[in-house]
Amino acid sequence: MELMARYEDNYFDLAIVDPPYGIGAGSKKFINRNTANKKAEAFYRDNDWDIAPSKEYFNELKRVSKNYIIWGGNYFTNLLEPARCYIVWDKKTGDNSYADCELALTNIDGNARVFTKFWLGSHANNGTPRIHP
């Protein structure tokens, strides 16, 4: 919030953000019990990281950005205006406990779009940088 306050209205052409969803993921048990997940479970359980941003955060984001893409936007529908254009990331994860896709809410005036790229969390990395599409 402090950083965004420094910028004038519509300073950025595009903001792409992936805020914490506020779903209490830090308190959940990971399904897969391999070593990597046990380490992640301990880290996230001991850190209060999954707190959803406030309405003020989104107001400030919209103020400084001409356009925005908010990953996990479906978790913030109570804080954002309805959107026409969503980006759907089909992760092609198959039959498991992970989400099949992620949704990004945008203020871009266009139709919803689907992006397909296999990703299964930390298990799909294989040297690929860990970023959203």
PLM regions: where:
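Class I S-adenosyl-L-methionine
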Residues: 2-17, 21, 25-47, 62-133
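Soluble or luminal CAZymes and related metallo-dependent hydrolases
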Residues: 49-57, 133
